[in-house]
């Protein structure tokens, strides 16, 4: 399993989420997953909403193009980003 997969123009990310971090950032690889730190707490879906907003901004897509496929209630998530307009350097390095 790879942390980042390009599939028919969409990006599939296997993520490990660190909630309540000091700032939002893509940290790097964490085993077979990409570690993402977010400032939101894991309460009442706030972390998922914040993650979607952060990823939408990072990939320059609308929030409606960011889909959490697996892991709604856990730290391990699988996320699909429909037709990303931009790919952050940390992630494009993993695609090569």
From Swiss-Prot:
InterPro entries xrefs: DUF167 (IPR003746), YggU-like_sf (IPR036591)
GO cellular component: cytoplasm
Gene3D superfamilies to which the protein is assigned, alphabetical: YggU-like (3.30.1200.10)
Pfam family membership, one: DUF167
Homology family: Belongs to the UPF0235 family.
UniProt name for this protein: UPF0235 protein SO_3356
């Amino acid at each position: 399993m790879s942390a980042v997969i390009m599939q028919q123009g969409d990006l599939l990310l296997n993520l490990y989420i660190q909630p309540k971090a000091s700032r939002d950032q893509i940290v790097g690889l964490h085993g077979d997953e990409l570690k993402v730190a977010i400032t939101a707490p894991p309460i009442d879906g706030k972390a998922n909403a914040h993650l979607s907003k952060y990823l939408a901004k990072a990939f320059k897509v609308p929030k409606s193009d960011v889909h959490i496929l697996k892991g709604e209630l856990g730290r391990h998530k699988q996320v699909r980003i429909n037709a990303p307009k931009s790919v952050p350097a940390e992630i494009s390095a993993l695609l090569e």
